[in-house]
Structures are given as C-alpha cells and as structure tokens.
C-alpha cells in the first residue's frame, strides 16, 4: 500500500461554553491516543440534513466551480462508505448517524458587516437570516454550513482567544452551536480554503481531482467538520481521552489521506473524485476512508 500522505497543521481546538462548542480544524498529525469514547450526549442519529449557505457579496470571488462542487459533495456523501463509518458511534438509545443529504442551499450577496474579519456572532446572525428567508428549522439533526469568499476571514469567539482563520492563525474551520427557543442550531464555520492552501490543505501544487483546488480543499475541510457534527454535535458525544480539544473522529485523522490516484483523488463518492481525509474507526483503532 502506498504510504499515506500527511497534512502538517497545528493541533485542533474544541471547547464547550454556554450553549456552544467549537472545533478548529488543525492537527499536526493523526492522534494515537486510542479509540474514541462515548460521553453520554446526542449524535445526529438517523439522517443529517445539511443546509449550505454561500455568503458571497457582490464583487467577491470564489473559484468557478466552488459552489457546484460543494453542493455535489453534499449530494454524494450520504451513501458513502466514509459516512457509513459513523454508524458505529451510537447514542444512549443505540441509534446512530446513518445517512446525510443536502436539504437546502442559499446564496447571499449582501455585504459582510465587516471586512476582512467576520466574528462568530456574524456567522450566527447569517444562519438565522438564511433560516428566516428559507423557512429552515433548527434541530439536532440539522447542520448549517456557512462558506465565505476569498480574502474574508472568520474569527473564533473571544473566549477562545479570538484567533482568526488562516493565514492569520492556524484556524481552518470549526463547528459550533447555539440555542434558540425552537431548538439547537449546529453549524460549521467555513472560511475560504484558498486563503491558505499551504496551511489548510496540501499546498497549491497538488493535483486537484476536480480541477478546482480551492473547492477540493474546502470539501476536505467540510468532510472533517461534517463527520464531527454527526458524531459529536454538542461536545458530549464521541471523542478520546485527550478530550474534545483534539480527540474527535476527524481530529484523530486530520491530514491522513488514502493513496492518491492519477487524478489526485483518494476516494470516489457516487462515481465522483474527491480528496478528503480519513476518519477514525474504533473497529480497527485507526483511520479509514470507508467504515466497518
């Protein structure tokens, strides 16, 4: 077997505060601290509904196929072997994440409230705006992904140091949540990966299986956050003994890819090529691209 390629990033940060939980997608190497452990909270049992928000003000830039490839990923991932890996991570009633689907998309061309740095509160407000416009509802099985454009950066909450996304720091993406009277809102904050391909992917010279390296890099970040939202949506699900700072199933395999084919893909979902990191599999105590 070809040796796995590794992405060199700094350690992932997860923390629980008030009604929220934060995960930074950054890890220098795959963790080797043993299997993940259940901590008594919910998972996204059954079907995850993914809602995608492209926040792209007039005049901003994303790569030509960025939106379409991200939407394709969400249509492809739900029946994949990678998502099936989540089925071993059950909650108290023995139910597990089974499937995921793209439930809705929204493109918002309204200006950012601040340039070039958005705060986490801005991301939360954007989600609430999209929910209001689209009629979307919160819930434990609903995941909202907010994507921003080139040269706009997202800053984590001040309680976590207020660090802003790469190349300003080693933050690449995170998942978080907040409560509303209608239920919990769970989301991934997804800065534009093209802002720092070296810090948040494999560099700019790697082969791009979809001929759009910004989109391929963003999909890799998306996959990491989606699998962690499925198995540890509230910071009380599945993570290892190091804690949820760097012990969720994506963290333990951050930067670990399968062998790449001639196109630069390490996996195919629904016949489409992708380059995404592996995820932790308790059944083999290691990283896999397809579950048990």
Give the ranges of each region predicted by the language model:
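Bacterial N-terminal signal peptides that target proteins for export
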Residues: 2-12
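Bacterial N-terminal signal peptides
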Residues: 11-21
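Cleavable N-terminal signal peptides
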Residues: 17, 26-28
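N-terminal carbohydrate-binding/catalytic regions of secreted carbohydrate-active enzymes
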Residues: 29-128
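Structural recognition of the beta-strand scaffold that forms the well-ordered cores
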Residues: 49-54, 83-84, 99, 104, ...
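Solvent-exposed loop/turn segments at secondary-structure junctions
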Residues: 56-61, 150-155, 192-197, 225-228, ...
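Active-site-proximal segments of metallohydrolase catalytic domains
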Residues: 95-178
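Metalloprotease/metallohydrolase-associated module, dominated by Zn2+-dependent proteases
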Residues: 165-216, 232-292
């Amino acid at each position: 077997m070809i040796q796995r390629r590794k992405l060199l990033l700094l350690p992932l940060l997860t923390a629980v505060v008030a009604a929220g939980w934060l995960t930074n997608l950054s890890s220098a190497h795959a963790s080797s601290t043993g299997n993940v452990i259940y901590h008594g909270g919910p998972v996204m049992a059954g079907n995850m509904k993914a809602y995608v928000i492209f926040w792209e003000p007039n005049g901003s830039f994303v790569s030509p196929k960025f939106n379409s490839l991200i939407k394709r990923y969400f249509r492809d991932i739900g029946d994949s072997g990678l998502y099936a890996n989540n089925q071993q991570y059950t909650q108290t009633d023995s139910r597990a994440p089974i499937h995921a689907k793209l439930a809705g998309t929204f493109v918002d061309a309204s200006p950012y409230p601040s340039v070039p740095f958005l705060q986490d509160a801005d991301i939360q407000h954007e989600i609430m705006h999209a929910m209001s416009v689209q009629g979307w509802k919160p819930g434990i099985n609903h995941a909202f992904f907010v994507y921003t454009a080139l040269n706009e950066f997202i800053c984590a909450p001040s309680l976590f140091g207020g660090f802003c996304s790469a190349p300003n720091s080693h933050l690449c993406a995170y998942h978080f949540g907040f409560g509303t009277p209608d239920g919990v809102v769970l989301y991934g904050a997804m800065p534009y990966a093209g802002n720092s391909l070296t810090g948040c992917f494999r560099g700019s010279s790697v082969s791009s299986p979809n001929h759009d390296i910004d989109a391929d890099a963003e999909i890799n970040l998306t996959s990491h956050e989606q699998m962690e939202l499925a198995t540890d949506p509230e910071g009380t699900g599945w993570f290892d003994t190091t804690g949820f700072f760097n012990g969720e199933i994506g963290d333990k395999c951050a930067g670990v890819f399968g062998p790449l084919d001639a196109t630069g893909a390490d996996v195919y979902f629904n016949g489409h090529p992708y380059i995404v990191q592996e995820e932790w599999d308790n059944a083999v105590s290691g990283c896999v691209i397809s579950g048990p």
